[in-house]
Amino acid sequence: MAAPRVFPLSCAVQQYAWGKMGYNSEVARLLASSDPLAQIAEDKPYAELWMGTHPRGDAKIFDNGISQKTLGQWIAENQDSLGSKVKDTFNGNLPFLFKVLSVETPLSIQAHPNKELAEKLHLQAPQHYPDANHKPEMAIALTPFQGLCGFRPVEEIVTFLKKVPEFQFLIGDEAATHLKQTMSHDSQAVASALQSCFSHLMKSEKKVVAEQLNLLVKRISQQVAAGNNMEDIFGELLLQLHQQYPGDIGCFAIYFLNLLNLKPGEAMFLEANVPHAYLKGDCVECMACSDNTVRAGLTPKFIDVPTLCEMLSYTPSSSKDRLFLPTRSQEDPYLSIYDPPVPDFAIMKMEVPGSVTEYKVLALDSASILLVVQGTVIASTPTTQTPIPLQRGGVLFIGANESVSLKLTEPKDLLIFRACCLL
């Protein structure tokens, strides 16, 4: 009998401190639904579910017909399951890590280097940059999701410089004036002025940052107490960030970066060198396999200011332009494809109404990982002997060129995400 090429996975949960607690976390709810033996602790954070072969969370295989115990081991011995192009392009490795994130408190403001810079940084400082790969990533909201992403239009930054004197103080009059003067100039002049302003902020002395932040927090708190609305300078968000990261330079970044409020199904794509931070909510995320992160604030960890200021993409764009839109499949009315401009990964979203009794997941020339977010199905393939029951939180590995038939076992809508590589 041929070895199975479609099988369920048991995936790693990461309990980082910023995660949502207990059953407030979508990660915990998915885990509890898919594993009846899972013990969810209400006083512990459930931050990330990892679906892939990353050494710090290689998915486990419990199929008795498979001798390998993890997905990484299995792929190493079943290279053709990746798909011929994927295998050759990515040296026999699964090129992506698929995740669910449940964010309670903001993650650090960060950017990820492109391939060329990653190789250089890894060579120079492997203790901070553990590999030589780039790390593009994409987040698709499962619940209302808030994040910072990319530099705002210059007009908006200039407005904040006028309305927030503490922000202007840290940037300095010269850099701020220069930015105002370049508003009507070409993109290169704008980028240069923006880099100068951001670098001034990032290179400010900690003591001065803390003083200015305290002044701003005091001013906003007094205005809010007096019943005034401070949302024109994101008063509530600033107070919240300061409470979580007192004195942190990242609190001022909200005046530089777009604030995105994603509705379920909306996405943002974070290409190399784009500053970003996840603030709160639940999402599915897919990324290239890398741990390289250059931090900019909202963190107690190492901040490499010179590298950060040098590498960032200083191209302003509106928050609307930062949304990444899926394309609807022509052949399948229930399928949307989020296909970013990188070779490492794509995400497919399948929303199947409960009135449908059977749904076919089409074969791809790529290994893929499928996550059930809503609904209950029984999966079968032409090559599997035993059908595989999957419910909410269930994760299925699908080898290249394998199709899967999903039988809906109850008349409830089905929501599935599938990470793959569309070369």
UniProtKB/Swiss-Prot annotation:
Binds 1 zinc ion per subunit. One of its GO terms (biological process) is mannose to fructose-6-phosphate catabolic process. It catalyses: D-mannose 6-phosphate = D-fructose 6-phosphate. The active site is at 295. The modification Phosphoserine is found at residues 102, 108. One of its GO terms (cellular component) is cytosol. InterPro entries: Man6P_Isoase-1, Mannose-6-P_Isomerase, Pmannose_isomerase-type1_CS, PMI_typeI_C, PMI_typeI_cat, PMI_typeI_hel, RmlC-like_jellyroll, RmlC_Cupin_sf. The keyword Metal-binding applies. Keywords: Acetylation, Cytoplasm, Isomerase, Metal-binding, Phosphoprotein, Zinc. Isomerase that catalyzes the interconversion of fructose-6-P and mannose-6-P and has a critical role in the supply of D-mannose derivatives required for many eukaryotic glycosylation reactions. This is Mannose-6-phosphate isomerase. It comes from Macaca fascicularis (Crab-eating macaque).
